[in-house]
Amino acid sequence: MREQIEGSRAVAHTVARCRPEVICAYPISPQTHIVEELSRLVKTGELAPCEFVNVESEYAAMSVGIGASATGARTYTATASQGLLYMTEALYNASGLGLPIVMTVANRAIGAPINIWNDHGDSMSQRDSGWIQLYAEDNQEAVDLHVQAFRLAEELSLPVMVCMDGFVLTHAVEPIDVPEAGPVDAFLPPYEPRQVLDPDEPVSIGAMVGPEVFTEVRYLAHARQMRALELIPEVAAEFSAAFGRTAGGLVRPYRCEDAETIVVALGSVLGTIKDVVDELRDAGTRIGVLGVTSFRPFPLEEVRAALGHAARVVVLERALAVGIGGIVAANVRMALSGIHLHGYTVIAGLGGRAITKASLHRLFADAIADELEPLTFLDLDRALVERELHRGRTERRPGPSAENMMRDLGPTATGIG
């Protein structure tokens, strides 16, 4: 049913209609409204049978999720930022044990320095943890990806992260078609676990594995992800047929057919990029954008097919691999191995910095003129950086860089001026 609703609440109601049996979570902004609404639904009996487990930390949340899933319960949790990092050890256990947990990641920057706003640094840090990672462009897709995520997780015996931009999506109130229970039930059958701890049929899971088998175990994890490359578009097509709208899949090209310049991005920034692409197209510029929905597994063949004819590719990403640069860009380069074109990595929107149409127009103009550096930081205040570098060279104890630069900016740094 289409209604005016906050993104977080829409996700919560959609998760409820997927009929989880155990929800375990610890609140952290900007994920909090999701789990608050789910706890309310459990308390009022609107979501039943379901146990909501209040835990003392994010590590505990994932640990409880592992136990619940291992005993055959459909399991859900949500987190963000430092909470996701706190879960890291347990995340690897969940995927290594083949447990189909679904988790919402309300993407938020990671510290230090502390920052509560949006970028993709949190989920990108877990790209090799064995979880499927799906990135939503808007709140409608965030809702729809959760329905698909439970189906994917349970068919593949793999956990799935649905990543949605914190605050930009989680706290946005807009018209969203929240799926009704009946169609969700038809699309998502009752959970039948492939492995379960059962006292009547005792087994152990997570046993120690020696060198003679460990490589094969890891290969199977990779093989399941490769199977996901086939299943993700199949499930997306079934969803489209059942619900009458498109969501999910591996990648989504927009005006790429004859494009000389193609931008690659994930998440909510795609909407702004599409607006700029339309404006440039109206002016005669052959440009397009490729939205990546599935970052893990990464769709090498589909990315290569979409980008291989372009003269240049601009990868715009909201996370930074310190010491090398782009994360998404490294995967795109692998997809384009052997193809000669101009490639640019652009780090943008870190810590919630706005990515404006004006900035994108300037960026794309420089890219089309092949005047970009291979690694570019969008709207970087170079004077501010140079002052801090000079301070570090000339003072024995210059103080914390973040605080120094905030002082240099003055009242505008805190939004006072």
Where are these regions (language model features)?
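Thiamine diphosphate
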Residues: M1-S125, G130, V147, G392-M406
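Glycine-/acidic-rich phosphate or pyrophosphate-binding loops and their flanking alpha/beta elements
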Residues: E6-V11, E238-T261, K274
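Short helix-loop-beta junction
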Residues: S39-T44, E234, E238, D275-V289, ...
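Conformationally flexible catalytic loops at phosphate/diphosphate-handling active centers
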Residues: E46, C50, V160-R252
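Glycine/aspartate-rich loop-and-adjacent alpha/beta segment that forms the canonical ThDP
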Residues: Y86-M87, P159, D165-Q195, E386-G417
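Conserved thiamine diphosphate
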Residues: W117-G166, L341-R353
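Redox- and metal-dependent alpha/beta enzyme cores, enriched for Fe-S-associated oxidoreductases
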Residues: P253-T285, F298-A305
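Peripheral docking tails and interdomain loops at the edges
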Residues: E317-G417
